[in-house]
């Protein structure tokens, strides 16, 4: 972060949802760290942002959420607006997020691959710093045929129905509809943080989770000789999709983040800042992670599979979900 960092401590032992903080407009590069302490031992805390303290609910945007039982405090970097005051408030829910969802804190990472990484593609560079400014949850598994069929009423997969195989041949549009229905279902069950939703991960969120704090070609290191311990690919998959969770997860607990089926990402495929893209149509979506039929180079953390239209149906294509703020709603 550029500029001075000042900590604003937010003590919330009782009046959860009542505390609020105001940041006045500023032209400086100052960054404040909003620190929340003394939270209950269970449940989920959500931090909201608005330009009007008296605004109604729909004018407050959820910018960060975290399981309060995991931390005694949570620091969130925030920047004042150049034009309007920024108000922050806290809410808390006594809920348990589904156990298959892993919470990831805000953080910075290097996205993309360096010029010297073997078998890299031109759209993977240049390496650039990315800030994930919100906590979010990501599914430790790819969505299975069982989960997809139960919610959607059909199974587009190329295989016979098998409960623990990842669903494949899913279009981006269908994956989005799955997320919409899952949001409605878990909202009704009161297991979803307020202001958050199920959706596809952005490319940045996906690579952040895949890398798990590493800068190597794969989440476990650089050696292709170890890939078969971590992902299903051309040399160990017998040419077929494998059950989820059968190999070693990455350091943050995500299974099949390398290989098995490709995973749709939410945002539109574009060149990185200062980089080159294979398509500039502005309508294409992107797969990540590689698949069971792919060579090792496609399973690298930085690899961006060829862009496709949202209605594209591919035998290698699946997805996993995140619980996160609506795309574009976080602070950046």
Regions found by a protein language model. Give the residues of each.
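Bacterial N-terminal signal peptides
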Residues: 1-10, 14
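Short, composition-biased motifs enriched in small/polar/acidic residues
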Residues: 14-98
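Acidic glycine-/aspartate-rich tracts in secreted/extracellular proteins
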Residues: 39-42, 51-55, 114-116, 143, ...
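A short glycine-rich, aromatic-capped structural motif
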Residues: 95-157, 170-173, 258-259, 325
């Amino acid at each position: 972060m550029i500029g001075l960092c000042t900590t604003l401590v937010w003590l919330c032992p009782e009046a959860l949802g009542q505390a609020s903080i105001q940041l006045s407009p500023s032209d400086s590069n100052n960054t404040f760290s909003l620190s929340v302490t003394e939270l209950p031992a269970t449940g989920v805390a959500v931090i909201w942002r608005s330009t009007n303290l008296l605004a109604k609910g729909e004018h407050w945007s959820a910018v960060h959420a975290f399981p309060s039982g995991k931390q005694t405090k949570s620091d969130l970097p925030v920047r004042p607006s150049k034009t309007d005051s920024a108000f922050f408030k806290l809410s808390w829910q006594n809920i348990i997020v589904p156990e298959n969802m892993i919470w990831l804190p805000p953080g910075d990472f290097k996205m993309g691959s360096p010029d010297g990484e073997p078998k890299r593609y031109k759209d993977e560079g240049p390496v650039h710093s990315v800030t994930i400014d919100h906590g979010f949850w990501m599914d430790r598994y790819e969505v299975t045929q069982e989960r997809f069929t139960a919610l959607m009423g059909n199974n587009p997969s190329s295989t016979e129905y098998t409960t623990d195989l990842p669903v494949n041949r899913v279009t981006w549009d269908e994956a989005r509809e799955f997320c919409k229905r899952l949001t409605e279902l878990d909202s009704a069950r009161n297991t979803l943080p307020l202001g958050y939703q199920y959706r596809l991960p952005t490319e940045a969120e996906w690579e952040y989770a895949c890398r798990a704090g590493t800068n190597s070609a794969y989440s476990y290191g650089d050696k292709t000789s170890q890939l078969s311990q971590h992902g299903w690919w051309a040399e160990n998959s017998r040419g077929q999709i494998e059950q989820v969770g059968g190999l070693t997860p990455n350091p943050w607990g995500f299974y099949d983040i390398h290989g098995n089926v490709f995973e749709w990402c939410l945002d539109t495929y574009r060149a990185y800042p200062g980089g080159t893209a294979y398509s500039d149509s502005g309508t294409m979506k992107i797969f990540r992670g590689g698949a069971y039929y792919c060579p090792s180079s496609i399973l690298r953390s930085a690899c961006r599979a060829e862009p496709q239209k949202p209605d594209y149906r591919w035998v290698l294509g699946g997805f996993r979900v995140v619980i996160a703020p609506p795309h574009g709603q976080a602070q950046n």
